[in-house]
C-alpha cells in the first residue's frame, strides 16, 4: 500500500518539480528508497498500474568509443569538386609520334639586323672570266732620264749629195807637177844643123778644170749629232737597267701572275695598308691596281691561292666615296661587291679584294695580304 502511495505522489507531482527532482537524484547517490515517503515495513500489495513515461533525462557523459563495426558499402560518388591548384611539372614523357605538317603561317615582320658575321672560309677558285674589252689608252708617263751612251752603230746608208758649198779661199801654190806625157810625133822635118841648147822657157798658163769626180762615202757625223745619239742610247740603257732591277726584286716574291706588261706578285705576309704600300715601293713596284677584268682575275688567283683577302692600291682619302689610283687618277675599272662601298663605321678608306674577285671598302689599319704590281 505504501508503495502504491509513493507512486501516486510521484505521479501527481508537477512535471517541473519532477524534472528538478530527477536531476537532483541523478547528481547524488540514492541511499534510501523511501526518501520522499516515510516507509514502514508492510506486506507486499498488488502491483500498481504502469505509470506514464517520464520526460527524457539529460544527456549522459560521452561513453568510451565502441569497437569498430564492419565496413559499410561504398556510398554513391559525391559531386565533382572544384579544380585544385596546378601541380608541379611531371617528368618529361617520351616524344609522341610526329604530327602532320601544319599550315604555313603568315610571314613574320623582318627582324633586326644581326651583327656582321665573321668572314667565311674562302670559296673554291672560280673559272677565269672572259677577257674584258681593252681599256682606254692611258696618259703618257713622265719623260725618262737620259740613258747611258750606247755602242757605236754601223755605218749608215749613203745619203744624197748635199748642196754645193761656197767657193773656198784659194789655196797655196802647190809644188810643180810632174812632166806630162810626150805628145805624138810630128812629121819629120828636114835635118837641120844642130844648134846650141837654149835657156828654159816660161811656165805655161793653168789648164781648164777637169770634170767633177764621183762623191766619196759619208764620213763620221759631227760631234753634236754624235752626242745626241749617245744620250739616247744612255737613256735606253738606264731604262733597261731599271726594268731589270724591278724584275730582279719581283723575283724575290714567292709566286705571281703575269698579264700583258704587268706582273702581280704576292708576299707571304699580312700588313696594314701603309706598311704594305711601303713594302711594294721598296721592291720597285706598287700595290696591285687592276685596271681590267683580266688583271682583276690574275689578282684573284693569288688571293684564292693564299685564302686571304688582299689590299689594293686605291683609296678615297682625298674625297669620301671617290676612289682613285695612287696617281690621283679616277678608276677606269671596278668590281664592287653588292652594297659596297658603304664606309661602314665612317673609317673605311681603303679597298680589299675577296677570293671571289669582288671589292670591299675596308679600314686601312686592318692587316691584309700584300700583293705588289710590277
UniProtKB/Swiss-Prot annotation:
Residues 259-374 form the C-type lectin domain. It comes from Rattus norvegicus. The modification Hydroxyproline is found at residues 77, 95, 170, 176. Residues 1-19 form the signal peptide. InterPro entries: C-type_lectin-like (IPR001304), C-type_lectin-like/link_sf (IPR016186), C-type_lectin_CS (IPR018378), Ca-dependent_lectin (IPR051077), Collagen (IPR008160), CTDL_fold (IPR016187), Surfac_D-trimer (IPR015097). Glycans are attached at residue 89. One of its GO terms (biological process) is negative regulation of phagocytosis. This is Pulmonary surfactant-associated protein D. Residues 137-163, 170-200 have a biased composition (Low complexity). Pulmonary surfactant consists of 90% lipid and 10% protein. There are 4 surfactant-associated proteins: 2 collagenous, carbohydrate-binding glycoproteins (SP-A and SP-D) and 2 small hydrophobic proteins (SP-B and SP-C). The modification Phosphoserine is found at residue 109. Its main location: secreted. Residues 222-253 form a coiled coil. Residues 40-221 are annotated as: Disordered. The gene is Sftpd. Belongs to the SFTPD family. S-nitrosylation at Cys-34 and Cys-39 alters the quaternary structure which results in a pro-inflammatory chemoattractive signaling activity with macrophages.
